[in-house]
């Protein structure tokens, strides 16, 4: 039986690969997509997500979500993903539109209609998920678990300690981590290992139309990294759903720093139990890289 999932995303180049896997992995049933401001503005992430759904002819409803963090000023990653978030490929024009309600309400409505609890997957800032949990707490029993790409037990990627998706809205992440729902965190500890090799990247244009499109996106903004390999951060959250055997997880207490002058957005991961608090997150700490690479090749070969 396919696993029903809702995907909250901020495409973004590596989001495009994760979305492809969510659509084409035969084990998954992607039923709803929502967008959030993150890599670029929410207007741009929504446009990019609709372009991808049209590219794959995927009839999946999409709702536009939060334009700004819960409390603080927005930040983006346009320096990595470009001003549009997904330039480099000539997508065909379309007339698709998002649903007419905010993302967190679309998630609420879909959860309440679902015949069984649904797995939420969040690969951008956690603003929409925090709004859902704070404004619609009656939804919690209908959430099977939340799988996120975000955080780190060690180094950060936008500050010395903080990973971008958490740092973009620390208050939202703190709300989510305190919520009591089951959480699996695929942070930089594993995503920095999730590298597609230059040899494999070179084969993408001949793989299928998806490979050609992804290669164009990668080449446009990450041409230098193409020679050393590309990290597939967001894809790890999808990979865990399908191949949890590739990941080493440890239950830990995790809190989000929201006050520190130098540490705001840091996920404080108590690996050794120093704080004596009960674990609230299953933290991915290691990855079978070869197995991951093989799985990626298999799922992208289906993405035609």
UniProtKB/Swiss-Prot annotation:
One of its GO terms (molecular function) is purine nucleosidase activity. GO terms for biological process: purine nucleobase metabolic process; purine nucleoside catabolic process; pyrimidine nucleobase metabolic process. It is an enzyme of class 3 (hydrolase). It comes from the Bacteria. Disulfide bonds: none annotated. Its EC number is 3.2.-.-. Hydrolyzes both purine and pyrimidine ribonucleosides with a broad-substrate specificity. Belongs to the IUNH family. RihC subfamily. The active site is at 233. Keywords: Glycosidase, Hydrolase. One of its GO terms (cellular component) is cytosol. This is Non-specific ribonucleoside hydrolase RihC. PANTHER family: INOSINE-URIDINE PREFERRING NUCLEOSIDE HYDROLASE (PTHR12304), NON-SPECIFIC RIBONUCLEOSIDE HYDROLASE RIHC (PTHR12304:SF15).
């Amino acid at each position: 039986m396919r696993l029903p999932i809702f995907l909250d995303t901020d495409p973004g180049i590596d989001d495009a690969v994760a979305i492809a896997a969510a659509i084409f992995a035969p084990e998954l049933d992607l039923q709803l997509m929502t967008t959030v401001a993150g890599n670029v503005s929410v207007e741009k992430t929504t446009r990019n997500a609709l372009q991808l759904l049209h590219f794959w002819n995927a009839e999946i409803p999409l709702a536009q979500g939060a334009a700004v963090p819960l409390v603080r000023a927005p930040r983006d990653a346009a320096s990595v993903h470009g001003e549009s978030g997904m330039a480099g490929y000539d997508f065909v024009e379309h007339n698709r539109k998002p649903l007419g309600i905010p993302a967190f309400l679309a998630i609420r409505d879909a959860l309440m209609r679902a015949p069984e609890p649904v797995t939420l997957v969040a690969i951008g800032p956690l603003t929409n998920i925090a709004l859902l949990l704070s404004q619609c707490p009656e939804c919690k029993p209908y959430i099977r678990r939340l799988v996120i790409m975000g955080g780190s037990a060690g180094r950060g990627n936008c500050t010395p300690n903080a990973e971008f998706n958490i740092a973009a809205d620390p208050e939202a992440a703190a709300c989510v981590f305190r919520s009591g729902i089951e959480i699996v965190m695929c942070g930089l500890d594993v995503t920095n290992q999730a590298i597609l090799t230059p040899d494999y990247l070179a084969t993408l244009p001949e793989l299928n139309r998806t490979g050609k499109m992804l290669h164009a996106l990668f080449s446009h903004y990450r041409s230098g990294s193409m020679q050393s390999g590309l990290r597939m951060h967001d894809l790890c959250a999808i990979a865990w759903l399908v191949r949890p055997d590739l990941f080493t997880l440890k239950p830990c207490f995790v809190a989000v720093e929201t006050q520190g002058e130098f540490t705001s957005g840091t996920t404080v991961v108590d690996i050794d139990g120093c704080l004596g608090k009960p674990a609230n997150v299953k933290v991915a700490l290691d990855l079978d890289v070869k197995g991951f690479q093989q799985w990626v090749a298999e799922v992208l070969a289906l993405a035609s």
